[in-house]
């Protein structure tokens, strides 16, 4: 995650590394209308159908998930993959903040984990943070298959 140029060298990357690379490129070229965001959205069976069995098995309606994207002239641009459709999650965004490219390394994880801890405190969820984080990891693994 530290070397954003790996996106080009390896021809792959995450939502974090791809958008951080593009924002960094924009900054270095004095392109001011590009903003970089982390959005926390309700990852659920509707917007992420592949994880339904995991959510169902654990009796969870959704898990707050972090996703990175750009806004260019205020319009969301998501280049995570050719199938990325921000429209799938835009109505499920719980919170978003603008960040700098170097914040995707440590800050993104801390921000996401803090959000989850607060969500657990303020929801009827009976699972622990560790349980939720592990279920989330299982969902992410399922999505990479």
How should these model regions be labeled?
Residues 1-14:
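Secondary-structure boundary elements
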Residues 3, 24-30, 78, 92, ...:
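Acidic-enriched, low-complexity/disordered segments with a strong bias for Aspartate over Glutamate
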Residues 11-38, 70:
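Cysteine-centered nucleophilic/redox motifs
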Residues 39-145:
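His-Asp-centered catalytic microenvironments across diverse enzyme cores
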């Amino acid at each position: 995650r530290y070397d954003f140029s790996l996106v080009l060298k390896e021809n792959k990357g995450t939502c974090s590394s791809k958008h951080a690379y593009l924002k960094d490129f924009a900054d270095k070229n004095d392109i001011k209308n590009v903003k970089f965001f982390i959005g926390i959205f309700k990852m659920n069976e509707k917007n992420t159908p592949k994880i339904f069995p995991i959510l169902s098995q654990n009796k969870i309606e959704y898990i707050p998930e972090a996703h990175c994207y750009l806004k260019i002239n205020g319009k969301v641009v998501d280049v995570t993959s050719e199938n990325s459709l921000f429209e799938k999650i835009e109505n499920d965004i719980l919170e978003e903040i603008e960040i700098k490219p170097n914040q995707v390394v440590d800050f993104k994880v801390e921000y996401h984990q803090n959000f989850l801890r607060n969500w657990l405190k303020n929801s009827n969820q009976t699972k622990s943070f560790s349980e939720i984080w592990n279920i989330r990891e299982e969902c992410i693994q399922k999505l990479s298959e």
